[in-house]
Amino acid sequence: MTKPTTEQPTIVKCPTCQSAVVWNAESPFRPFCSKKCQMIDFGEWADEEKSIPGAPDMSDSDGWSEDQY
Protein backbone atom coordinates (compact mmCIF):
# COMPACT_ATOMS: atom_id res chain seq x y z
CA MET A 1 0.00 0.00 0.00
CA THR A 2 1.34 3.45 -0.87
CA LYS A 3 1.46 6.33 1.55
CA PRO A 4 -0.41 9.52 0.73
CA THR A 5 1.98 12.29 -0.23
CA THR A 6 2.08 15.19 2.19
CA GLU A 7 4.94 17.07 0.57
CA GLN A 8 4.91 20.81 0.96
CA PRO A 9 4.96 22.73 -2.30
CA THR A 10 8.24 24.36 -3.26
CA ILE A 11 8.13 28.08 -2.57
CA VAL A 12 10.60 30.49 -4.22
CA LYS A 13 10.99 34.25 -4.07
CA CYS A 14 10.16 36.31 -7.14
CA PRO A 15 13.52 37.67 -8.38
CA THR A 16 11.95 41.10 -8.98
CA CYS A 17 9.70 41.82 -5.98
CA GLN A 18 10.69 39.03 -3.57
CA SER A 19 7.08 37.83 -3.05
CA ALA A 20 6.47 34.11 -2.49
CA VAL A 21 5.76 32.02 -5.60
CA VAL A 22 4.60 28.39 -5.56
CA TRP A 23 6.78 26.41 -7.98
CA ASN A 24 4.31 24.28 -9.93
CA ALA A 25 2.56 24.08 -13.29
CA GLU A 26 -0.18 26.41 -12.06
CA SER A 27 2.36 29.27 -11.78
CA PRO A 28 2.82 30.23 -15.45
CA PHE A 29 5.38 32.98 -14.82
CA ARG A 30 7.62 31.07 -12.41
CA PRO A 31 10.05 32.03 -10.97
CA PHE A 32 8.25 35.38 -11.28
CA CYS A 33 4.97 36.13 -9.52
CA SER A 34 3.43 37.92 -12.52
CA LYS A 35 3.91 38.94 -16.14
CA LYS A 36 4.77 42.45 -14.89
CA CYS A 37 7.72 41.19 -12.80
CA GLN A 38 8.83 38.98 -15.70
CA MET A 39 8.87 41.98 -18.08
CA ILE A 40 10.71 44.19 -15.56
CA ASP A 41 13.44 41.54 -15.37
CA PHE A 42 13.56 41.20 -19.16
CA GLY A 43 13.94 44.98 -19.49
CA GLU A 44 16.85 44.99 -17.04
CA TRP A 45 18.65 42.35 -19.13
CA ALA A 46 17.86 44.20 -22.39
CA ASP A 47 19.21 47.48 -20.96
CA GLU A 48 22.31 45.57 -19.80
CA GLU A 49 21.62 46.48 -16.16
CA LYS A 50 22.10 42.75 -15.50
CA SER A 51 24.79 40.59 -17.04
CA ILE A 52 26.65 37.35 -16.53
CA PRO A 53 30.19 38.12 -15.35
CA GLY A 54 33.01 37.24 -17.68
CA ALA A 55 35.38 38.56 -20.27
CA PRO A 56 33.75 40.07 -23.36
CA ASP A 57 33.95 37.91 -26.48
CA MET A 58 34.80 40.74 -28.89
CA SER A 59 35.33 44.46 -28.89
CA ASP A 60 35.47 47.07 -31.63
CA SER A 61 39.26 46.98 -31.41
CA ASP A 62 39.32 43.33 -32.53
CA GLY A 63 39.00 44.25 -36.20
CA TRP A 64 35.22 44.09 -36.37
CA SER A 65 34.77 47.85 -36.52
CA GLU A 66 32.60 49.26 -39.32
CA ASP A 67 35.26 51.95 -39.93
CA GLN A 68 37.42 49.27 -41.51
CA TYR A 69 35.11 48.73 -44.51
From Swiss-Prot:
Residues 46-69 are annotated as: Disordered. InterPro entries: DNA_gyrase_inhibitor_YacG, Znf_NHR/GATA. Zn(2+) binds at C14, C17, C33, C37. It comes from the Bacteria. Keywords: Metal-binding, Zinc. Its cofactor is Zn(2+). Binds 1 zinc ion. Pfam families: YacG. Residues 59-69 have a biased composition (Acidic residues). Inhibits all the catalytic activities of DNA gyrase by preventing its interaction with DNA. Acts by binding directly to the C-terminal domain of GyrB, which probably disrupts DNA binding by the gyrase. Interacts with GyrB. Belongs to the DNA gyrase inhibitor YacG family. PANTHER family: DNA GYRASE INHIBITOR YACG. NCBIfam families: PRK00418.1 (NF001638). This is DNA gyrase inhibitor YacG. The gene is yacG.
